[in-house]
Structures are given as C-alpha cells and as structure tokens.
Amino acid sequence: PFSSGKVFLGLSGSDSNDTQYKLFTYANNKLGKEKKKKMIARKKGYHGVTVTSASMTGLPNQHKLFDLPQENFIHTETPHYFKEGKEGETEEDYVRRLSETLEETILDEGPESIAAMIAEPLMGAGGVILPPKGYFPAIQDVLDKFDIPLIVDEVVTAFGRTGNAFGSETYEIKPTSMTIAKALSSGYIPISAVIVNDELFEPIKEASGDIGAVSYTHLRAHETG
C-alpha cells in the first residue's frame, strides 16, 4: 500500500494494534500535538483482545463485564449497505451519509483531539462485511481534510485473501500505518508486525533514543522467519 516504510515486529494482531495506539500517542507527543489522544474505530470492527485493542473493537460482547471501551476510543457507523441502507438510498448516497456522519463525529470530538482512525479493509469477526463501493476513498477524503491518519488492520485480509496482496489495494485504501499478523507465518508461529510509512517515521526517528532497546522485538519467531 506504500512504497517504503519501517517494520516493528510483535507476536499477535492484538499486541500490534496496541502498538499502533502507543506509536501514534508517542509520535504526537514528540511532535508537540499532545491533545491528539483519541482514536476512531467502527461499530462491529474487531482489533484484538487486549485492553487497548478490545477498546478499538466495536463488538459489545467484547466490552461488557470488562469496563470497556477505555476513554479516548470512539466508534463510528458500520459500512453495511445491505443491512443499514435506507429504502431508496443508493450505494453512493449511503457512502456519502457515512462520510458525513464521520465528519460530524470528528467535529463533535474536536479534530485537534483525534490521533488516528483504525479500520479493517473488510470486517471479519463483525460479520464478514464488505465495504460499499467508494467507501474508503470517501472517508479518507474526510480524514485528509482534518489531517487524521488511517491505520489499516490487515490481520485477516493481507497476503492474498481479497485477490490482491493486501486488502488496501482491493478497496483503494491509502494507509499511514498497517497491522499484519496471522498469514505472515501461515499460522505456524506467533508473529505480527506494524508497518509505518516514511512520512510518519522520518519526523520521529531521532526521538527513538528516548525509549532505548526494545528486547520485546527480539523473538525466536523473528529469527525463524
């Protein structure tokens, strides 16, 4: 989905989506954008089982009894045209309505407070929901308007599942960052990765010395790969 970038390895899609939240919080703090702490996800989206990734998830059964989602996680509408489209509403009109709803949500929350949006190219655990035609270009127009990056969760869709190498190609997505996992090892060993484009990496690369060595990324699965 982007020509060059940097990779941070992990063990699972859940922990890599945790890393996504940490990464964007870290980047915004280093760039003097400390107010950018909120993340937009979608109802019925699935991003993992840890506290942070489950907060991104838009499935109520993943929230009840766990006091989730945490603060700073917002959920916008599910792009399910066949179920949620109104009578007489075309697919194009439906996409327009969802993009307008997203813009209203951003304005209500305050664009200056939104760190990123995360989305699966097609929703897996939420019901295998394919986005309507033109959905991602439309919502990216809204995100670009407010300088909000898009994280694409390709744990389910990467490596050919949608007919292209990545679901981002199939659905015309231009992500700033991407999560991959299961298919990275064909499911044989636990491994995942966060891939960020150079536009995100370059401004913060010198700040990485504040963290020091990250032994968490020195795993046997990575050596095996």
List PLM regions with ranges.
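Conserved N-terminal phosphate-binding loop of PLP-dependent enzymes in the Aspartate aminotransferase
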Residues: 1-220
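A short, hydrophobic C-terminal helix/tail in secreted or cell-surface proteins
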Residues: 221-225
